[in-house]
């Protein structure tokens, strides 16, 4: 069994614990969805998310009466980001405009140029001095699911928030090969 000092040493060698609240997300909104000021505000109002997951598929090869699992293709799941909503609905509206541009509720039409709506999103982990310790870039991201704003007449001491699931082609990190 390790001693407390060995445990503390392992933590110290790694730079201390990674605080759960030390992160930032940078969404490069399309120009039609948000101005530079709106983009900055939306990024500041992001309150929860996860790191991107990477999953390898499985290829089952029958051999000798068994199935041998071999690694398959890499898959990426949508990344949920929860935002605080403000009175002017800026964060929600920016995501909604972006999503409507991809496929409008009324027009049922998409933009002619997908390069206009596929955008990179950068997620960074930070240390206590705001130095970046790890980076992921979600390449070709777009808002797949724009969550609801929960409204409640009996709510007190709370605010509205919503979650947007970003779908993307792939996530690359500072350790990707």
Swiss-Prot record:
The keyword Nucleotide-binding appears for this protein: no
Gene Ontology terms describing biological process: symbiont genome ejection through host cell envelope, contractile tail mechanism
GO cellular component terms, A-Z: virus tail, tube
Localization, UniProt: Virion
Keywords in alphabetical order: Late protein, Viral contractile tail ejection system, Viral genome ejection through host cell envelope, Viral penetration into host cytoplasm, Viral tail protein, Viral tail tube protein, Virion, Virus entry into host cell
Function description: Structural component of the bacteriophage tail which consists of a contractile sheath, a tube and a baseplate. The central cylindrical segment of the tail consists of a rigid tube, composed of multiple copies of the tail tube protein. During infection, contraction of the sheath drives the central tube through the host outer membrane, creating a channel for DNA ejection from the capsid into the host cell.
Record-stated family: Belongs to the T4-like viruses Gp19 protein family.
Protein name: Tail tube protein
Species annotation: Serratia phage KSP90 (Serratia marcescens bacteriophage KSP90)
């Amino acid at each position: 069994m390790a001693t407390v000092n060995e445990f503390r040493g392992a933590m110290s060698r790694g730079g201390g614990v990674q605080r759960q609240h030390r992160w930032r997300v940078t969404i490069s909104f399309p120009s039609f969805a948000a101005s530079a000021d709106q983009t900055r505000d939306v990024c500041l109002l992001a309150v929860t998310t996860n790191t991107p997951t990477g999953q390898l598929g499985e290829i089952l090869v029958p051999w000798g009466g068994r199935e041998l699992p071999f690694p398959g293709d890499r898959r990426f799941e949508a990344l949920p980001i929860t935002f605080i909503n403000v009175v002017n609905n800026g964060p929600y509206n920016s995501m909604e405009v972006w999503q409507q541009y991809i496929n409008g509720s009324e027009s049922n039409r998409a933009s002619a140029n997908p390069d206009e709506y596929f955008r990179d999103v950068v997620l960074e982990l930070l240390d206590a001095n705001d130095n970046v310790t790890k980076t992921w870039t979600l390449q070709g991201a777009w808002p797949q699911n724009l969550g609801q704003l929960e409204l409640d007449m009996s709510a007190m001491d709370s605010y509205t928030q919503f979650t947007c699931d970003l779908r993307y082609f792939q996530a690359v990190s500072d350790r990707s090969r």
